[in-house]
Curated annotation (Swiss-Prot):
Organism: Bluetongue virus 17 (isolate USA)
Protein name, as recorded: Helicase VP6-A
Keywords, in A-Z order: ATP-binding, Capsid protein, Hydrolase, Inner capsid protein, Nucleotide-binding, Virion
Subunit structure: Homohexamer.
Signal peptide bounds: none
Sequence ranges of Gly residues compositional bias: 106-122
Subcellular location: Virion
Gene: Segment-9
GO molecular function, one term: hydrolase activity
InterPro entries, sorted: Orbi_VP6 (IPR001399)
Listed Pfam families: Orbi_VP6
Length: 325
């Protein structure tokens, strides 16, 4: 039996059901007016409810509980769809498409549609790259597509993995910080004019075309449109898995869920009543106000296995632990 924070269990409820693992979740509700939190047991299975000796809730209590669950589910959805900073396409040395929608797969500068065949190669025949080794490994592991890491080469087309996709890929806090630092370095170079000459050359060519004949104008226009794209750097922020796959190719590798018979875990709980029979506990940053007390009591028990989140997505780490216990 495994103890874990209530919000981690709640986020993982669907995957736990697929694994045929029972859930005993003690929910919590914050009362208005600064009153003390009140705790109500939520019984995920009749068998566990009877074991813990918890009584059947009244009809009004069930309605309140249902409303709380709906609210929590809405909050969860908002968290998972949160937009990180710098959510639009950024151009270094070339102008990005200002009207590009975040999810349509269009790449600024080249005008290409990723869904229409840009794939892993991107616009102008160049391949997409990422900013850290951890992100490259996560993409290859999840989608089976090998992607290179940016090595300060110019030109380049860079994928910035944003907040919601970071969680989907299970990127650690250290990995997120490393990507942020590399982005800052690139923007610092842009500010210092590292790529300014490339843009300036393109601008001069564009002005010349007004004085040439029609044939020369066409040639100059073609060269001008290609010059910034060839010399500059494009950074494309990506929030969704769908857009990422349209850019790099590949498909998500879906592993068959591990059933209860293949996992040592039969029950997960955040109830302090289950501490005595728990064999392991998993702790992570949580909004469960009662988890601190549960974890403290569990740590006093002899011969109990303790696991702690490494700073990545708590749900991903929790399910990984269950599958390997």
């Amino acid at each position: 039996m495994l103890l874990a924070p209530g919000d981690v269990i709640k986020r993982s409820s669907e995957e736990l059901k697929q694994r045929q693992i029972q859930i005993n979740l003690v929910d919590w509700a914050e009362s208005e007016g600064g009153k003390e939190d009140k705790t109500e047991p939520k019984e995920e299975s009749k068998a566990e409810g009877s074991k813990d000796g918890e009584g059947t809730q009244s009809e009004s209590g069930q309605k309140e509980e249902g409303g709380k669950e709906t609210k929590d589910a809405d909050v969860d959805r908002r968290i998972h769809t949160a937009v990180g900073s710098g959510s639009s396409t950024k151009g270094l040395g070339e102008r990005a498409n200002e009207n590009a929608d975040r999810g349509d797969g269009k790449v600024g500068g080249g005008g290409g549609d990723a869904d229409a065949g840009v794939g892993a190669t991107g616009t102008n025949g160049r391949r997409w790259v990422v900013l850290t080794e951890e992100i490259a490994r996560a993409i290859e592991s999840k989608y089976g597509t090998k992607i290179d890491v940016y090595r300060d080469e110019v030109p380049a087309q860079i994928i910035e993995v944003e907040r919601s996709l970071q969680k989907e890929l299970g990127i650690s806090r250290e990995g997120v910080a490393e990507q942020t630092e590399r982005l800052r370095d690139l923007r610092r170079k842009e500010k210092n004019g590292t790529h300014a000459k490339a843009v300036e050359r393109g601008g001069r060519k564009q002005r010349k075309k007004t004085h040439g004949d029609a044939q020369r104008e066409g040639v100059e226009e073609e060269k001008t449109s290609e010059e910034p794209a060839r010399i500059g750097i494009t950074i494309e922020g990506v929030m969704s898995q769908k857009k990422l796959l349209s850019m790099i190719g590949g498909v998500e590798r879906k592993m068959a869920p591990i059933g209860a018979r293949e996992s040592a875990v039969m029950l997960v709980s955040n109830s302090i009543k289950d501490v005595m029979r728990a064999t392991a506990y998993f702790t992570a940053p949580t909004g469960d106000p009662h988890w601190k007390e549960v974890a403290r009591e569990a740590s006093k028990k002899k011969n109990i296995l303790a696991y702690t989140s490494t700073g990545g997505d708590a749900k991903t780490e929790f399910l990984h632990l269950i599958d390997h216990l």
